[in-house]
Amino acid sequence: MALLPVLFLVTVLLPSLPAEGKDPAFTALLTTQLQVQREIVNKHNELRKAVSPPASNMLKMEWSREVTTNAQRWANKCTLQHSDPEDRKTSTRCGENLYMSSDPTSWSSAIQSWYDEILDFVYGVGPKSPNAVVGHYTQLVWYSTYQVGCGIAYCPNQDSLKYYYVCQYCPAGNNMNRKNTPYQQGTPCAGCPDDCDKGLCTNSCQYQDLLSNCDSLKNTAGCEHELLKEKCKATCLCENKIY
């Protein structure tokens, strides 16, 4: 899986930086708080529902404690770079978006900045220019991703970008084979008519295929084959679900 690009945003400096990041503006962003978790999930679902062109198979996102633990652990390292994909795995591979700021910024603003990369993206074509950064957007709206967990850290070891936001996404998006079409275009919920909640699908799959030809392997070898049991769990175990 390709690493996502990192978004750097320099915001206006506060008159003084807090010791150890204990100021109320920072602690209000900690993702141990239910209201912060709701803000993050609701913002993601609001944006996923609003994609243009509309999506027929966009899953509704939910908060994951396991994913949050991984995201917070990585944020605490204050490296300002992506984690090793192996360190953010759950039952599936997981993606990751990063945001850095010089002062505390709301989660909604950070998430919106990732989505705003849509301005440099054309559905079905890809980035508008070779240097355009769109990987945060495509991960955020990846149709089969349904779990999100985020963490934030204050990083006094950094010169200016001292606030480090990390969101991880499971299953991972940005599959190189279909990165230019992060979802299926169509009427909302057309791909999940019996599992729809306000324009988003709820029939998620907890597994992920590790091979690109699992459908054909299922037809030729069957799901009892050891290879499919290990590498094609979504195809074999998630009938009528989105993966």
Curated annotation (Swiss-Prot):
GO terms for cellular component: extracellular space. PROSITE patterns: CRISP_1, CRISP_2, SHKT. CDD domains: CAP_CRISP. It comes from Homo sapiens (Human). Residues 1-21 form the signal peptide. InterPro entries: Allrgn_V5/Tpx1_CS, CAP_dom, CAP_sf, Crisp-like_dom, CRISP-related, Cysteine_rich_secretory, SCP_CRISP, ShKT_dom. It is found in: Secreted. Residues 205-238 form the ShKT domain. Interacts with NSUN4 isoform 3. Keywords: Disulfide bond, Secreted, Signal. Belongs to the CRISP family. This is Cysteine-rich secretory protein 2. It comes from the Eukaryota. Its main location: secreted. Gene3D superfamilies: CAP, Crisp domain. Testis and epididymis. May regulate some ion channels' activity and thereby regulate calcium fluxes during sperm capacitation. The keyword Endoplasmic reticulum does not apply. PANTHER family: CYSTEINE-RICH SECRETORY PROTEIN-RELATED. GO terms for biological process: sexual reproduction. Residues 41-169 form the SCP domain. Disulfide bonds join C189-C196, C192-C201, C205-C238, C214-C232, C223-C236.
